[in-house]
């Protein structure tokens, strides 16, 4: 022994037992003192590690295995004791490990990998950011250990493989320190892990593990997490014991491979998750791994990722597909795109939940991939394009139907419809800027519509315990342009879609929309007749049951769209029903002779809308009926377009009246089919058949109207000529006035909607609230007095109570209390005598209704007043208790309004100011629904007269 050894050398050498045994262990007391010595000062630590490095080199050269085992044990303890100064001696540790690993002695290499594990546990990011020499030697050590498991055979095969797997498992904790180095470690590790897993695990084994991770057992019982964690701990302990005792099995290797793979995915580093996902998929593709196996395995890997970061893997696949798409869809990258798309579909269609997933963003990217496949030039075959397109379609459907939040389905459908609208807009191009063909546009729009169809079909057949919001009619507003795209574009651009292609698009659109009506909108209560309890509660002003009934409409059973004014489909004329009918009118205007099959589909769709919407549909349809019906009493020659519209209008009105009795059986009691209007429809149809005005083949089979035998008697004039039969506005008005239920909700004088207010187009359905109406009218009642009652006080005629009156602000709602049968006759301009009589009635009845309230009016509300309170007045009220301030409209005012396209403003005092004082100079506009506010369509007298229905009206205008 050298008498002049330094103290640190003596302390180190004292730790080595004497002898040449191969399984030496350091002397414990001497090791403790050495650790204390090394930890006291940094310079001492440097001396210790440098001496150990030199001794290792000496012992390796002389094959002193026992001493090397002691050195590894000392290194492990030094790392643990001096971890805060690990950067001082980490390089030397790696050098020692590399030197010993190069001996390829199994016992030594087992201890090397354990020491490597301790080193990885105590490393931090500092060494990976600034010490290039350390990174180099650390990587060499890792590569050496990983290489031990490759192409091994014999009795020690499992031991060498376990060394590789343990090194890979240990390196997983160092991946996030340096992006470039971590990427290299992943590239070295993933192929080795997959090699072990693929060789020893068929797809059935992968699926079983996946099912276990999803906590779904064959018997339906959930797997206990505590039990699962305990099982994993026991497995890990068993592997360590077998590794120490040289008794490893294939099961140990398999479990360690899965455990190591899990350590790569089970991280909070998004970049690591992305890189590992890409490495797994890329390896499977390049090595020809069975696609179904690979998809199942990736699903298993996703279950190991923290749930809030699982979307990162999905986004990685989508980003890769995006890069491929930018490079161009060619045969050279078709297989890569196909496989990535299948992996993406596997994740989206699995039962793996992903929190934080941006559904709308992903759908937008998928739609872009679909669009580029069809629109962009490529050398792919049509079959290859079809395969990829179908995969993306399945991805969209799977994502949409895996419910994460209430509005997911509506949001997804809306994204698709917005894409369709954008594609349709792009079909209008300048002559020198054509990039796509009409056939490509057609194929893409039909594909996007098919996506929607698949979604509704899946939702119909898929039961879910998660409540969701349903797609509503208003979501489809943006898609109505498909019915008449030419009408929305009046610039110089031309549409590259041909007429046959447009007909194909429209046919697909109508079929998909009809599927929506029957599978998505018509759920629960909407399939049933109008709720009788709701009706009875509304007729009883003192009932409190109506609130509960209304709330039930929003339950899981679906909303009752047959309820009058559901979603304000009657009070608000700017609604989807009117918009849809307006675009149908544009549809007819675009064709001289519309396609029979397209019109047949339109009839089918509207019949389904009738069944769902009931009276709400009829109220919006009436203005369009008058617009479409031919004036057979004034002409005998009509275009084919006019015949189509006329036939279409009669078919819809016929089925509407036929269905109303069943939908509102308690209220109507078979009134519709026994009404004069119903008979007039049949006569009008028969007349058109006899005059060859009727268009056959647009009523779905079996057709009631076309199967009716021609045995009806059509009236003739004195010369024996058939009298032209045309249903006029007064016929429908008479029909509405004949039933107490219809009079409240049906508005025969509703104006024809000719323009859509863009601000009214909303993608979200309003709540069912029939109280969200105009309340310009106030009824002043003494405190403690009872509510208005119909019956005796009103001559025995039905007068709906305030809770039941539908306040629309429409002209048809204003009525004369003296009108025939006690019912309103609608608000027209009338003659000069009519205006004078109205003014007289106002003065006569104003005092009469002061205390008793008003039977009709625009916007009922109730204001209680005490005995000492000051009377408050209405805002724009036609009935007034301060009649001295009322200024009667003059005929000259009306004529002036018509000629200048302005509405009349009636001066009235303002009693509702902030200071309570009246302002005699204030004026109030006429009500929104007043004809005085309507702009005249034309100032040509002849055209005005031709549109009037009676001689009285014509005489008044003249």
UniProtKB/Swiss-Prot annotation:
GO CC, any one term: plasma membrane
Listed InterPro entries: ARM-type_fold (IPR016024), EFR3 (IPR039786), EFR3_HEAT-like_rpt (IPR049150)
Pfam family, one: EFR3
Coiled coil: none
Superkingdom, taxonomy of origin: Eukaryota
Compositionally skewed regions (Basic and acidic residues) per UniProt: 550-564
Protein family per UniProt: Belongs to the EFR3 family.
Name of protein: Protein EFR3
Protein encoded by which gene: EFR3
């Amino acid at each position: 022994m050298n008498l002049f050894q330094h103290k640190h050398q003596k302390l180190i050498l004292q730790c080595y037992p004497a002898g040449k045994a191969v399984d030496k262990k350091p002397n414990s007391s001497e090791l403790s003192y050495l650790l204390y010595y090394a930890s006291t000062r940094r310079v001492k630590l440097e001396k210790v590690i440098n001496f150990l490095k030199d001794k290792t080199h000496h012992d390796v050269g002389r094959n002193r295995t026992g001493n090397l085992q002691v050195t590894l044990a000392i290194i492990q303890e030094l790392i643990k004791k001096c971890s805060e100064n690990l950067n001082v001696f980490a390089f030397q540790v790696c050098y020692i490990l590399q030197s010993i690993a190069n001996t390829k002695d199994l016992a030594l290499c087992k201890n090397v990998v354990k020491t490597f594990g301790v080193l990885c546990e105590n490393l931090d990011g500092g060494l990976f950011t600034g010490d290039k020499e350390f990174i180099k030697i650390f990587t060499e050590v890792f590569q050496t250990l990983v290489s031990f498991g490759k192409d091994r055979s014999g009795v020690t095969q499992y031991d060498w493989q376990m060394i590789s797997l343990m090194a890979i498992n240990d390196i997983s904790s160092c991946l996030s320190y340096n992006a470039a180095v971590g990427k290299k470690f992943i590239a070295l590790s993933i192929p080795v892990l997959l090699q072990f897993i693929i060789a020893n695990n068929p797809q059935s084994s992968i699926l079983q593990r996946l099912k276990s991770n999803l906590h779904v057992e064959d018997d339906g019982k959930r797997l206990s997490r505590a039990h699962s964690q305990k099982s994993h701990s026991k497995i890990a302990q068993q592997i360590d014991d077998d590794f120490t005792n040289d008794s490893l099995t294939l099961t140990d290797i398999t479990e360690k491979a899965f455990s190591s793979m899990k350590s790569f995915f089970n991280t909070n580093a998004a970049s690591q998750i992305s890189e590992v996902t890409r490495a797994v998929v890329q390896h499977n593709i390049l090595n020809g791994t069975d696609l179904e196996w690979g998809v199942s395995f990736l699903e298993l890997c996703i279950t190991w990722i923290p749930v809030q970061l699982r979307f990162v893997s999905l986004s990685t696949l989508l980003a890769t597909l995006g890069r491929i798409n930018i490079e161009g869809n060619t045969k050279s990258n078709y297989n890569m795109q196909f496989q990535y798309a299948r992996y993406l579909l596997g994740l989206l269609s699995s039962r793996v939940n992903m929190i934080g997933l941006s559904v709308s963003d992903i759908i937008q990217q998928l739609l872009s991939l679909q669009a580029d496949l069809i629109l962009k030039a490529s050398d792919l075959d049509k079959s290859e394009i079809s395969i990829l397109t179908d995969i993306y379609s399945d991805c969209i459907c799977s994502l949409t139907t895996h419910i994460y939040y209430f509005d997911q389905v509506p949001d997804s459908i809306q994204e698709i419809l917005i894409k369709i609208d954008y594609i349709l807009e792009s079909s209008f191009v300048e002559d020198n800027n054509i990039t796509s063909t009409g056939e490509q546009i057609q194929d893409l729009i039909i594909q996007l519509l098919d996506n929607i169809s698949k979604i509704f079909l899946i939702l119909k057949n898929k039961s879910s315990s998660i409540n969701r919001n349903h797609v509503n009619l208003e979501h489809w507003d943006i898609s109505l342009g498909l019915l008449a795209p030419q009408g929305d574009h009046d610039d110089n651009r031309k549409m590259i879609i041909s007429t046959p292609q447009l007909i194909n698009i429209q046919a697909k659109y109508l079929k998909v929309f009809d599927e929506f009506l029957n599978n998505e909108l018509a759920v629960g209560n909407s399939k049933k007749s109008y709720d009788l309890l709701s009706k009875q509660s509304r007729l009883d002003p003192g009932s409190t049951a109506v609130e509960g009934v209304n709330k039930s409409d929003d339950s899981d059973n679906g909303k009752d769209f047959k309820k009058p004014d559901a979603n304000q489909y009657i009070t608000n004329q700017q609604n989807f029903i009117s918009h849809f009918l307006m675009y149908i009118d544009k549809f007819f205007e675009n064709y001289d002779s519309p396609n029979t099959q397209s019109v047949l589909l339109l009839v089918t769709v509207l019949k389904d809308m009738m069944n769902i919407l009931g009276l709400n549909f009829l109220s919006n349809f009436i203005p369009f009926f008058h617009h479409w019906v031919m004036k057979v009493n004034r002409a005998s020659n009509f275009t084919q377009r006019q015949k189509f519209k006329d036939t279409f209008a009669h078919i819809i009105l016929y089925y509407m009246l036929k269905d109303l009795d069943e939908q509102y059986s308690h209220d109507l009691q078979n009134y519709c089919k026994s009404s004069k209007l119903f008979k007039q429809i049949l006569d009008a149809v028969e007349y058109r058949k006899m005059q060859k005005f009727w268009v056959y083949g647009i009523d779905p089979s079996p057709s009631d109207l076309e199967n009716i035998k021609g045995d009806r008697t059509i009236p003739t004039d004195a010369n024996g000529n058939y009298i032209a039969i045309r249903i006029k506005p007064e016929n429908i008005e008479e029909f509405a006035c004949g039933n107490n239920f219809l009079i409240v909700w049906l508005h025969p004088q509703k104006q024809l909607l000719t323009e859509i207010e863009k601000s009214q187009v909303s993608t979200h359905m309003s709540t069912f609230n029939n109280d969200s109406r105009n309340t310009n009218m106030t009824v002043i009642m003494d405190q403690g007095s009872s509510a208005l009652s119909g019956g005796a006080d009103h001559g025995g005629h039905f007068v709906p109570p305030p809770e039941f009156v539908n306040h629309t602000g429409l002209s048809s709602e204003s009525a004369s209390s003296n009108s025939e049968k006690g019912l309103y006759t609608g608000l027209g301009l009338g003659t000069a005598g009519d205006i004078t009589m109205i003014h007289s009635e106002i003065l006569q009845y104003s005092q009469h209704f002061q205390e008793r309230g008003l039977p009709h009016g625009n916007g009922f509300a109730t204001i209680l007043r005490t005995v000492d309170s000051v009377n408050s007045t209405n805002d724009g009220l036609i009935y007034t208790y301060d009649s001295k301030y009322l200024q009667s409209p003059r005929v000259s005012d009306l004529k002036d309004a018509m000629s200048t396209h302005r509405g009349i403003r009636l001066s009235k005092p303002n009693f509702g100011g902030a200071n309570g004082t009246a302002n005699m100079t204030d004026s109030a506009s006429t009500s929104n629904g007043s004809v005085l506010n309507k702009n005249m369509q034309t100032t040509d007298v002849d055209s005005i007269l031709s549109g009037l229905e009676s001689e009285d009206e014509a005489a008044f205008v003249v």
